[in-house]
A protein has these predicted regions:
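N-terminal Sec-pathway targeting helices
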Residues: 1-13
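Generic N-terminal amphipathic/basic segments
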Residues: 3-5, 17, 57
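Sec-dependent N-terminal signal peptides of Gram-positive bacterial secreted proteins and lipoproteins
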Residues: 12-20
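Secretory-pathway ectodomains
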Residues: 22-463
Length: 463
């Protein structure tokens, strides 16, 4: 009899696991709804995802925004799921948006609508009701940049920004790799009002034959700026310039800016910038070649600074790529990421570049204020007044796992106010409006010795 009872118990457990796996898609479904509270920190498991190689170029992502009206955190995942969590880590609602990865997010000024971009066979842009998670409207990037699933060429809404009227400006993009290793690029900037009515697209009758990763908009100067970031410039490419300034009302090109490259690079690449100052008078950008630039609102260079000079050591060109550029009240911050070998990022480098994984802050007249150096890549930065919260992720050269976590910096002088460690690399960060709470998304990783560190988690820290 006891053997029969044991078999029944095991059978019930197996059926329960199968049911929970069907509902959650997680091999450890009991963790999907779990959270832990460690004093001033709350962590929530976001579900199973593949643990990626620590040293690979592309890596697990996550999206997070603070919703002041709800005192809550809007979280998007690589599993295609969108959550709203309160400040104690309690799930308010969850929405599964599709089969793709969520890759971009922006929230309306009244905090009623979230605009979410995904990478998938459709590449949808979603408008989501923040109160309940309902889909208000959607637009498929595949309609403007196409899709080639057989070649694993999927469209994405790679970046989103909004103006003061909550008009939405989105970069739709996909690339395809040919048999000879060359890349084909398809990009389009698309504008909508908050109800989903399309206002314009740029270019009107063709695609941008370059990688477009970033855009920003400003109401005071009436412009949208796009930056390009193609790996190489081919003779037959039409959209070869670095930045394109567009009339935000009509979608017509105002002017374009070609930022000349520095040796040994053949073109200038901007991936996490440029961004306008609030008054629209300035535009800050960081380049992959290691330069930080400040432009005026028309795209004229006011000054440039060498953050990370490409250096040749033992026949290898190494540099610390620049990525982010901002124009905020406290100054003009730029960031650099890991040290890379110019010939091939997968190749080792003789040394770390001394300017890697750093934030450089300048005054608007170009004078240097300070440098803050992290021990890993600053994956994302969010601001609350003159405080910056930074997600510190991987260092693919030193494998210093103690570097992972969220750091809070005083932008006035670069003082480190807080550091919250995570086991795995922190890939996204946000800070509350009052600066008292910080949240981040940790990702798992497989180390070179085969060990899995970290997990796909939301962390909420109370400062």
């Amino acid at each position: 009899m006891s053997r029969i009872k044991g078999c029944i118990t095991i059978g019930i457990l197996i059926i329960s696991w199968c049911l929970m796996f069907w509902i959650t898609g997680s091999r450890t479904p009991w963790q999907t709804f779990s959270s832990s509270d460690r004093g001033d920190e709350v962590s929530v498991f976001l579900g199973d995802i593949p643990s990626e190689n620590y040293d690979r170029m592309g890596f697990t992502k996550g999206l997070i925004e603070y919703i002041d009206n709800e005192n809550a955190w809007l979280v998007g995942t690589d599993r295609g799921e969108l959550f709203l969590f309160d400040n104690d880590g309690k799930q308010i609602w969850k929405r599964s948006l599709g089969i793709g990865k969520l890759v971009s997010m922006c929230v309306s000024h009244d905090e009623k609508i979230a605009f979410i971009g995904e990478q998938s066979p459709s590449g949808n842009l979603y408008a989501i009701d923040i109160a309940g998670g309902d889909i208000l409207w959607k637009f498929a990037a595949a309609n403007v940049v196409g899709a080639e699933p057989a070649k694993r060429s999927y469209p994405s809404i790679v970046h989103i920004c909004i103006d003061q009227n909550d008009n939405v400006y989105a970069n739709a993009y996909r690339f395809v790799t040919a048999k000879d290793g060359s890349r084909g690029y398809n990009g389009k900037a698309v504008a909508f009002n908050k109800n989903g009515d399309q206002l314009w697209q740029f270019p009107q009758n063709e695609n941008i034959d370059s990688w477009i990763n970033w855009c920003d908009v400003n109401d005071n100067n009436g412009k949208v700026v796009l930056s390009t970031s193609a790996y190489e410039i081919r003779p037959d490419m039409k959209y070869r310039d670095t930045m394109y300034l567009i009339n935000k009302e009509t979608g017509q090109l105002i002017n374009s800016v070609d930022v000349l490259p520095v040796a040994p690079f053949e073109n200038t690449v901007m991936r996490g910038s440029p961004n306008f100052s609030a008054n629209g008078e300035f535009l800050a950008a960081s380049c992959s070649d290691g330069r930080g630039l400040l432009f005026d609102g028309s795209g004229k260079v006011l000054w440039q600074r060498e953050l990370s000079k490409p250096t040749q050591i033992d026949d290898a060109w190494i540099n610390a790529s620049g990525r982010d550029g901002f124009a905020v009240d406290a100054g003009v911050p730029f960031t650099t990421i890991n040290t890379f070998n110019r010939e091939n990022w997968q190749l080792p480098t003789p040394v770390e570049h001394p300017s890697n994984n750093s934030m450089f802050v300048f005054n608007y007249d170009g004078t240097f204020k300070y440098k803050y150096k992290a021990l890993g890549t600053m994956e994302q930065i969010d601001f609350s007044g003159n405080i910056a919260a930074c997600a510190v992720g991987r260092n693919v050269r030193t494998h210093n796992y103690a570097a992972h976590g969220a750091v809070v910096i005083d932008l006035n002088d670069g003082a480190e106010l807080n550091f919250f460690h995570t086991d795995g690399p922190l890939q996204a960060v946000a800070i509350s409006t009052n600066g008292r709470n910080v949240a981040g998304i940790e990702a798992p990783a497989v180390t070179p010795d085969g060990k899995i560190i970290g997990a796909y988690k939301l962390h909420i820290w109370h400062r």
